[in-house]
């Protein structure tokens, strides 16, 4: 009898890690979906693109494989699953043009049942918000537009068109031929700062920040080789990470960094920290307007700070380097395949589901 009890206890212990692992999963993209299964009967297959604080909660932008288009999902504190706001947006790849996008949509029409041709004028390259209202950028035509939920579904409202699109490119010189090549750059982050849209644009060395005036589409830039990252802050300000000293690849991984607040309105910078080691440099972060603090991602650990000198470990996520957004009570983290929610106060994982919806 005692041996049997020990055997049962051992089996329970073996099963415990699996149960805990399942509890840590908010959404995971299913694997090995049978291609013969009709699209409307397949499980929801999403590739998570981004998360942003908006509409009193957070909005997750995801590419829905079943419908070959972008969908928006909403979650706020107290909800037990994410609600689909709508979909049907075209996801702009960095090399897309209106012509190639049209060809891609025509191909989707030939393979996806009930595929609806998207509005390519309002295709989405990046999505962000001012904390409440959603803003999207279409890099194919430079259009910046708002997205809002109405009784009739999601509606778009044009804001402005960028005065030129060359600022979203990157150039490099071939040392052997001395030729200069230009191609579309990766856009790593986007934030609304008052009447300005700030876009972080990857360059051959480091980054630059493109500032678009939302009233008329005019552009100015923050550009120098030491600039390494841009994150959101309060009251029309950005956080800028800069590399101290040489900008070669060795110093990027072993050097030190400065952190400053940048006023979009005045161009003034306020130095916050110097000599920050590479391992303590932010991988991703989010401003918390509810506590006037900043949450910083350090691989799997989330730390909170108010002065960028002292830090308080808050929670951990099961995946590394998630992108995060905050609500009043929670931190929401996403990567390519998953969505997680942690309580700010207790650090517990909330298991949610994404509502399925046709179309």
Where are these regions (language model features)?
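Repeated scaffold domains used in trafficking and secretory/extracellular systems
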Residues: 45-54, 90-97, 121-128, 167-171, ...
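Blade-level signature of beta-propeller repeat domains, shared across WD40, Kelch, NHL, RCC1
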Residues: 333-359
